[in-house]
């Protein structure tokens, strides 16, 4: 099953997440199909916290991709900000 989920990056104690479309059987930070955005929970000052390609997200959801709870909330936040 294809899922839209967070893949962790960044340094120790400084998380940075890529929002990726991946097969659910692959590892969290492993192989993915497409990167559709990023989420930086510790953004400071003028740094961007969230960037999401909503058109691609809608495409994948329409084709049966499931979203995790956290990604669903981020999508909702991105739509409200747009």
From Swiss-Prot:
<dbReference type="GO" id="GO:0005737">
    <property type="term" value="C:cytoplasm"/>
</dbReference>
<keyword id="KW-0689">Ribosomal protein</keyword>
<dbReference type="GO" id="GO:0003735">
    <property type="term" value="F:structural constituent of ribosome"/>
</dbReference>
<dbReference type="Pfam" id="PF00886">
    <property type="entry name" value="Ribosomal_S16"/>
</dbReference>
<dbReference type="GO" id="GO:0006412">
    <property type="term" value="P:translation"/>
</dbReference>
<dbReference type="GO" id="GO:0015935">
    <property type="term" value="C:small ribosomal subunit"/>
</dbReference>
<dbReference type="InterPro" id="IPR000307">
    <property type="entry name" value="Ribosomal_bS16"/>
</dbReference>
<keyword id="KW-0687">Ribonucleoprotein</keyword>
<protein>
    <recommendedName>
        <fullName>Small ribosomal subunit protein bS16</fullName>
    </recommendedName>
</protein>
<comment type="similarity">
    <text>Belongs to the bacterial ribosomal protein bS16 family.</text>
</comment>
<dbReference type="InterPro" id="IPR020592">
    <property type="entry name" value="Ribosomal_bS16_CS"/>
</dbReference>
<dbReference type="InterPro" id="IPR023803">
    <property type="entry name" value="Ribosomal_bS16_dom_sf"/>
</dbReference>
């Amino acid at each position: 099953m294809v899922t839209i989920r967070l893949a962790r990056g960044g340094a120790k104690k400084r998380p940075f997440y890529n929002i990726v479309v991946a097969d659910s059987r692959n590892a969290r930070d492993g192989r993915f199909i497409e990167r559709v955005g990023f989420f930086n929970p510790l953004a400071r000052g003028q740094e961007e916290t969230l960037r999401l390609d909503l058109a691609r997200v809608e495409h994948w959801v329409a084709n049966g991709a499931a979203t995790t709870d956290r990604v669903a909330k981020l999508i909702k936040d991105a739509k409200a900000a747009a």
